[in-house]
Curated annotation (Swiss-Prot):
The keyword Disulfide bond applies. Disulfide bonds join 21-125, 54-168, 83-97. Keywords: Allergen, Disulfide bond, Secreted, Signal. This is Procalin. It is found in: Secreted. One of its GO terms (biological process) is symbiont-mediated perturbation of host defenses.
Length: 169
């Protein structure tokens, strides 16, 4: 009976924390105004289930309102997911992401490293607001480049070696 209780307790804990996101170290001195301008090509990510984040991201900054847009498909309809938000503490940015006016997810982006001109490494914690995954969280690391280059930059090789990044494509 004690074994059953312990196993049940471990199972409950595993389920309760399965949807938790990580809390990576944010980049010191991050400049949102330099980062949130122009296009970023997502070249690598850790999400094993889908490479849905492998898009071209269009970013902008309008007086502290940060926007990230990319191609999105829902129920066969293709359009644009528009994520808008503001900076919060510790170089984290929280967005509400909408498709055709419906909030699909809330995303917290942690900038981990960037040179602003070539590469960016960041972590996304996504909380799904609609669809079959509503209420669930998913976290993954993403590497983006200003050009569609498939190589991990030398400056990030040490930081990314244990992240199990997968090449998009």
């Amino acid at each position: 009976m004690k074994t059953f209780i312990v196993i049940t307790f471990i199972g409950i804990l595993s389920y309760a924390y399965a949807d938790e996101c990580e809390n990576p170290e944010p980049m010191q001195g991050f400049s949102a105004s330099q980062f949130y301008q122009g296009x970023w090509y997502v070249t690598h990510e850790t999400s094993a289930x889908t490479l849905s984040e492998c898009n071209i991201l269009t970013t902008s900054n309008d007086n502290g309102k940060f926007t990230v847009k990319h191609k999105y498909t829902k129920d066969g309809x293709v359009g644009e997911l528009i994520c808008e938000g503001q900076a919060s503490a510790n170089n984290k940015f929280t967005y509400d992401c909408k498709f055709x006016g419906z909030t699909m997810e809330q995303v917290t982006r942690t900038a981990m490293d960037t040179d602003y001109n070539d590469y960016a490494l960041y972590y996304l914690c996504t909380t799904y607001k609609x669809g079959p995954n509503a209420g669930k969280k998913e976290g993954h690391y993403i590497l983006s480049r200003r050009q569609p280059n498939t190589e991990i930059p030398d400056a990030l090789k040490t930081k990314t070696k244990d992240l199990n990044l997968k090449l998009c494509g």
